Regions:
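Short, charge-rich, low-complexity alpha-helical interaction segments
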Residues: 41-66
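Unusually extended, aromatic-enriched hydrophobic runs near protein termini
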Residues: 25-31, 60, 128-137
């Protein structure tokens, strides 16, 4: 039997979401006023970070199965900030604290500093409607 390859792995989702977060942070930095798009951008960043945070354990499961505990723990520690920043950003959005949103988005941009996005990317605008989705949760 041949191996079954899952094209939608957690690692690929994390890479795609990381690029989308970088794009959203750049767009959020361009915003001059707090409109619906700014709310969508901030909500999308929070939701995407939460999704990344939730996928860390499944990424690490294969390493733990092979007893690579140090590598697994290092990976967890490397991505621990994602869930924390997602929660802080969510609280800042719900309390309309846009100064904190700006500060957190700058910190998030620093975390994703090494990610390069091509000019002709195919990411689109994944943040459209994210605020409604965040409020609905």
């Amino acid at each position: 039997l041949s191996r079954i390859i899952n094209p939608d792995s957690v690692g690929k989702d994390r890479a795609r979401l990381s690029k989308a977060i970088v794009l959203a942070v750049r767009e959020l930095a361009k915003q001059t006023e707090v409109g619906q798009e700014a709310k969508d951008l901030a909500a999308f960043i929070s939701l995407a970070l939460k999704t990344i945070s939730e996928g860390i354990d499944s990424s690490v499961a294969a390493w733990e199965k092979r007893d690579y505990w140090v590598k697994a723990d290092r990976f967890r520690m490397e991505w621990m900030w994602a869930g924390q920043y997602a929660d802080k950003l969510k609280v800042a959005i719900f309390t309309n604290d846009w100064g904190s949103v700006a500060m957190l988005s700058a910190q998030i941009a620093q975390k994703f500093g090494k990610i390069v996005i091509a000019q002709n990317h195919r990411l689109g605008k994944p943040w459209v409607g994210a605020h409604r989705q965040l409020v609905g949760k």
